[in-house]
Design a protein with these regions (language model features):
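Motif I (Walker A/P-loop) of helicase-class P-loop NTPases
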Residues: 75-85
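Short alpha-helical segments and helix-capping/turn motifs at coil-helix boundaries
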Residues: 8-9, 81-83, 134-147, 176-179, ...
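Inter-Walker segment of RecA-like/P-loop motor cores
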Residues: 119-174
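Conserved Walker A/P-loop ATP-binding site and its immediately adjacent core
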Residues: 91-123
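Signature of the SF2 helicase/ATPase Hel1-core->accessory helical subdomain module
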Residues: 84, 88, 102, 109-110, ...
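ASCE P-loop NTPase motor core, strongest for the SF2 helicase catalytic module
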Residues: 31, 58-61, 75, 114, ...
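The conserved Walker
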Residues: 71-73
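Conserved pre-motif I regulatory segment
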Residues: 1-68
């Protein structure tokens, strides 16, 4: 399949303006900065800050960018656009989507994996003629995930399950000969997509997420604010706000 331009993705997916703007911003950052594991985060931050001065800190142990979009803008569709762009333009094949609760987790599973679902986000995109392989927090222990190296994979996890399962995820998995956490941390191209990321900035889950050593983090939230004691602290890694 060809490399899909942001115009092409926006057209096929009928993206709304804020979704399209977000995709273009990701493209500009990915084209300006050589994103790789172990890169100099300070230099990368300087590059992002020069393009989007609102971003002053990645706030994590890896490059993480927040797109602050009002509720109802269609964040799942935007995730699909991010995935399509990173897959076809940058050859990224491993995506780890974190959901803040069971309801959103179930919705993400359907919207990202079920072509018969009217809200299936990859409809019409030739690169997903065969739907991407989905690995969920219900089946990561049993699935022989290492057998699907060639395909694009989307791991979908509920943050609460992630917190509870963390000890299991650190146990050796007979299929992969490593713990699931180690397996993910060793992937060269893991992109973390955090839905409603304001929910789990303070939780220990964030430490667990840092330990996955992703290549890149993309955060989507309508409320880019953390409550710290009686104060409300704004996210420092926002690159786009709508409205």
């Amino acid at each position: 399949f060809p490399q899909y331009t942001t115009d092409y993705i926006s057209g096929v997916m009928s993206l709304r303006k804020p979704q399209e703007n977000s995709l273009r911003i990701l493209e500009e950052i990915m084209t300006s900065i050589h994103v790789q594991k172990g890169m100099n985060l300070k230099a990368a931050l300087g590059g992002v800050h020069a393009l989007y001065p609102i971003c002053s800190d990645f706030e994590r142990d890896f490059m993480s960018l927040t797109f602050a979009l009002a509720t109802g803008v269609g964040k799942t569709r935007l995730m699909g656009a991010f995935i399509s762009y990173l897959y076809t333009q940058h050859g990224i094949k491993n995506f780890f989507v974190v959901a803040p609760n069971t309801t959103i987790y179930e919705k993400l599973k359907k919207d990202l994996s079920d072509p018969s679902n009217p809200k299936y986000v990859f409809k019409g995109l030739g690169c997903f003629h065969t739907p991407p392989q989905i690995v969920t927090d219900d089946d990561y222990k049993a699935r022989q995930i290492s057998l699907f190296e060639s395909d694009i994979r989307i791991f979908i996890f509920n943050i609460d399950k992630f917190n509870k399962e963390e000890s299991n995820m650190k146990k050796i998995n007979e299929y992969i000969g490593d713990s699931f956490c180690e397996y993910l941390a060793n992937l060269p191209d893991l992109v973390l997509i955090m839905d409603e990321s304001h929910h789990y900035r303070a939780k220990k889950g964030m430490q667990a997420i840092n330990e996955l050593h992703p290549l890149l983090g993309l955060e989507l939230t309508a409320t880019p604010i953390v409550n710290s004691g009686s104060k409300q602290v704004l996210f420092k890694n926002v690159v786009y706000e709508y409205p």
